[in-house]
Amino acid sequence: MNFETVIGLEVHVELNTNSKIFSPTSAHFGNDQNANTNVIDWSFPGVLPVLNKGVVDAGIKAALALNMDIHKKMHFDRKNYFYPDNPKAYQISQFDEPIGYNGWIEVELEDGTTKKIGIERAHLEEDAGKNTHGTDGYSYVDLNRQGVPLIEIVSEADMRSPEEAYAYLTALKEVIQYAGISDVKMEEGSMRVDANISLRPYGQEKFGTKTELKNLNSFSNVRKGLEYEVQRQAEILRSGGQIRQETRRYDEANKATILMRVKEGAADYRYFPEPDLPLFEISDEWIEEMRTELPEFPKERRARYVSDLGLSDYDASQLTANKVTSDFFEKAVALGGDAKQVSNWLQGEVAQFLNAEGKTLEQIELTPENLVEMITIIEDGTISSKIAKKVFVHLAKNGGGAREYVEKAGMVQISDPAILIPIIHQVFADNEAAVADFKSGKRNADKAFTGFLMKATKGQANPQVALKLLAQELAKLKEN
């Protein structure tokens, strides 16, 4: 029997506000343990939460970006559970009235087709702290993350393969990043994914029993974990067994999913309205204000890059996959840089450098200004493409102006015939054997002089001018 795969994803995104959702403490990542905490995060008796308006702003933007309806009358709820990283023994979240509902996002699949994936809801909530289990037998709790604002985006069970789940996450990450509400860095925990997967016989409308997957720390592992579950569940069903509703984690080392616990249901959390936060209303004016702050999204940028700038669909997709790269490209083109040349550099030398250094574009000294200046001095013949690669590395590490560096470093290309012709004559004088081979008609003997000339000029001879002059002087040499 063949089975249809049914997948839904729950994505937690940390919102990039300066302070936490219910306390004035910093929400920034990377500080010392428990440095970003106060009495609200510690749940001291008598302290009360105060809602951060910036979190609601971000929630509205997310809902608009994901084509969602917005609940204009909102409240928060308590989700009750005990764990050491949750000192209140409950989490403030949204249960029956999330900020956004009934949305969708269009994704592009590997075969070039598109599919619309429904989004059931997006709700605001606070993050929990972090437990670390030491080798000394003690467990340690860091509450820096406690109270960091989250939006949980819950898809419909519309995905029918791990490939579609991967495409959905890629599209969702782009939209959230462009909306400016999160950096969506999985390595820092600002984007976390749980997957729900079940199988059912083709033609059956009722969903099968689902399994939840956790510990999916990359899009690649989401795909691998889902692929493993498809095989595991299919084998159980074909052998006459039944799937249990359970939570499993993906073990990257063994490339398998491992049982964590039997899955709880919503009733286990005993949700009830949060009494310390009153009901509040989101006005139409507030929604429209947030709408005006939304930028052009990846899909629209890609279309513009193709229609207005003449880029290929592939180049447009690569450039818009990351907002930082796309914004860099936008500024470089606005400064007069040739769109195709800027695109080639960003996808070629710049991407290779970032991969080798393990850095992002924001972490190096390259700017749209000095990249455009470098492209300009390539085009006007000041430097060759070969020398430009060395210039780029300097700019990426040290910044500054491209032309100024080239002139100070003595890298300016030699294009003046009055300088090159005497050097060519000296090359002839220094390589008498090669001259003799050329005059005797030895095959490809002329090719050697190109290398001799570039060596004599330390690679600074303008290749086009130098080859033309070399051919001219070799012709004269043959006549004599």
UniProtKB/Swiss-Prot annotation:
Q: Which gene encodes it?
A: gatB
Please name the PANTHER family in this protein's record.
Answer: GLUTAMYL-TRNA GLN AMIDOTRANSFERASE SUBUNIT B MITOCHONDRIAL AND PROKARYOTIC PET112-RELATED, GLUTAMYL-TRNA(GLN) AMIDOTRANSFERASE SUBUNIT B, MITOCHONDRIAL
The entry's keywords: ATP-binding, Ligase, Nucleotide-binding, Protein biosynthesis
**NCBIfam families from the xrefs?**
gatB (TIGR00133), PRK05477.1-1 (NF004011), PRK05477.1-2 (NF004012), PRK05477.1-4 (NF004014)
Q: Which organism is it from?
A: Streptococcus pneumoniae (strain Hungary19A-6)
**Family classification:** Belongs to the GatB/GatE family. GatB subfamily.
- According to the UniProt entry, what is the EC number of this protein? 6.3.5.-
Query: Is Protein biosynthesis among the key words of this record?
Result: yes
Q: Which reaction does it catalyse?
A: L-glutamyl-tRNA(Gln) + L-glutamine + ATP + H2O = L-glutaminyl-tRNA(Gln) + L-glutamate + ADP + phosphate + H(+); L-aspartyl-tRNA(Asn) + L-glutamine + ATP + H2O = L-asparaginyl-tRNA(Asn) + L-glutamate + ADP + phosphate + 2 H(+)
UniProt xrefs under HAMAP family = GatB (MF_00121)
**Is the keyword Zinc assigned to this protein?**
no
Name of the protein this chain belongs to: Aspartyl/glutamyl-tRNA(Asn/Gln) amidotransferase subunit B
Superkingdom as given in the UniProt entry = Bacteria
Functionally, this protein is described as follows: Allows the formation of correctly charged Asn-tRNA(Asn) or Gln-tRNA(Gln) through the transamidation of misacylated Asp-tRNA(Asn) or Glu-tRNA(Gln) in organisms which lack either or both of asparaginyl-tRNA or glutaminyl-tRNA synthetases. The reaction takes place in the presence of glutamine and ATP through an activated phospho-Asp-tRNA(Asn) or phospho-Glu-tRNA(Gln).
Q: How does it assemble?
A: Heterotrimer of A, B and C subunits.
Set out the biological process GO terms recorded for this chain's protein.
glutaminyl-tRNAGln biosynthesis via transamidation; translation
**Per UniProt, what is one Pfam family of this protein?**
GatB_N
Gene Ontology molecular functions: asparaginyl-tRNA synthase (glutamine-hydrolyzing) activity; ATP binding; glutaminyl-tRNA synthase (glutamine-hydrolyzing) activity
